From Swiss-Prot:
It comes from the Eukaryota. GO terms for cellular component: chromatin; cytosol; nucleus; plasma membrane; protein-containing complex. Inhibitor of the caspase-activated DNase (DFF40). The keyword Iron does not apply. SMART domains: CAD. The modification N-acetylmethionine is found at M1. Heterodimer of DFFA and DFFB. The lineage of its organism: Eukaryota, Metazoa, Chordata, Craniata, Vertebrata. SUPFAM superfamilies: C-terminal domain of DFF45/ICAD (DFF-C domain), CAD & PB1 domains. Caspase-3 cleaves DFF45 at 2 sites to generate an active factor. This is DNA fragmentation factor subunit alpha. Pfam families: CIDE-N, DFF-C.
């Protein structure tokens, strides 16, 4: 009698080759070399080799380098041989730890306490990879990200970018120039604001502004008593962005392009309530963020256009160059 082919009886032609991998628990430095043809097989061997109790299953496999969760077989097959995995039980979370060269292990109890520092350790690497893919993304970075890359030792950043230390020193110098330019722009805006304030006082406009602010304050109080609290709860901005908006002069120069876009999309009234501002100030800051975002995107687009133009004009390797025209004899 012929047996029907099911999930337990794979086609011999579909048998996948074994992939060598390295396994470890997230609280141990000991790692084991295993070979598996699928994620399910790797999970099974992880439970067996690492003595993970069945009560702690299902386990999650993450890349030891950056904590990426691996739950897709096709992605698993694309990984190189001897990829390092960390096996996480159901009550554990991955966190970056640089003390052992980038391998991660942490128990659930210590996860919350160590989270900020570890995230910062991973964040600069993610920003560095972004620059590696497209150098023009420097324009889109926040001041915090720019400073983080400047503070990283040259050797570490060079290793992450696969560049020489001399090249990375030039890059860090460029990053510092971008920071300096934003600071100069901030100081210029502050001076302009002071000048405008002086003009307002001389022109006796201040009294009119007080009346306007009083009216806006009454409007804001009405919002607070009714819809205001609901709007404040609807603000989706991170607390770090709100702090930057409230405390930094010319905050649009400190934010990343992604943060600028988030601020631009917020409801002005909700933003005003969240920051305890009048609506006019919230709208002014939103407009500044929108303008700064458009400027950065335009700069990136210009860089890409110049790059494409340069690539079209440069002959490909092996491509014959056009012969230059001979100069006419003036005699």
């Amino acid at each position: 009698m012929e047996l029907s082919r099911g999930a337990s009886a794979p086609d011999p032609d579909d048998v996948r080759p074994l992939k060598p991998c390295l396994l470890r628990r997230n609280h141990s430095r000991d790692q084991h070399g295993v070979a598996a043809s699928s994620l399910e097989e790797l999970r099974s061997k992880a439970c067996e080799l690492l003595a993970i109790d069945k009560s702690l299953t299902p386990i999650t496999l993450v890349l030891a380098e950056d904590g990426t969760i691996v739950d897709d077989d096709d992605y698993f097959l694309c990984l190189p041989s001897n990829t390092k995995f960390v096996a996480l039980a159901c009550n554990e979370k991955w966190i970056y730890n640089d003390s052992d060269g980038g391998t991660a292990w942490v128990s659930q109890e210590s996860f919350e306490a160590d989270e900020p520092d570890s995230r910062a350790g991973v964040k600069w690497k993610n920003v560095a990879r972004q620059l590696k893919e497209d150098l023009s993304s420097i324009i889109l970075l926040s001041e915090e990200d720019l400073q983080a890359l400047i503070d990283i030792p040259c050797a570490e950043l060079a290793q992450e970018l696969c560049q020489s230390c001399a090249t990375v020193q030039g890059l860090q110098s460029t990053l510092q120039q971008v920071l300096d330019q934003r600071e100069e722009a901030r100081q210029s805006k502050q001076l302009l604001e002071l000048y405008l304030q002086a003009l307002e006082k001389e022109g006796n406009i201040l009294s009119n502004q007080k009346e306007s602010k009083a009216a806006l304050s009454e409007e804001l109080d009405a919002v607070d008593t009714g819809v205001g609290r609901e709007m404040a709860s609807e603000v989706l901005l991170r607390s770090q962005i709100l702090t930057t908006l409230k405390e930094k002069p010319a905050p649009e120069l400190s934010l990343s392009s992604q943060d600028l876009e988030s601020v631009s999309k917020e409801d002005p009234k909700a933003l005003a309530v969240a920051l305890s501002w009048d609506i006019r100030k919230a709208e002014t800051v939103q407009q500044a963020c929108t303008t700064e975002l458009a400027l950065r995107l335009q700069q990136v687009q210009s860089l890409h256009s110049l790059r494409n133009l340069s690539a079209r004009r440069s002959p490909l390797p092996g491509e014959p160059q056009r012969p230059k025209r001979a100069k006419r004899d003036s005699s």
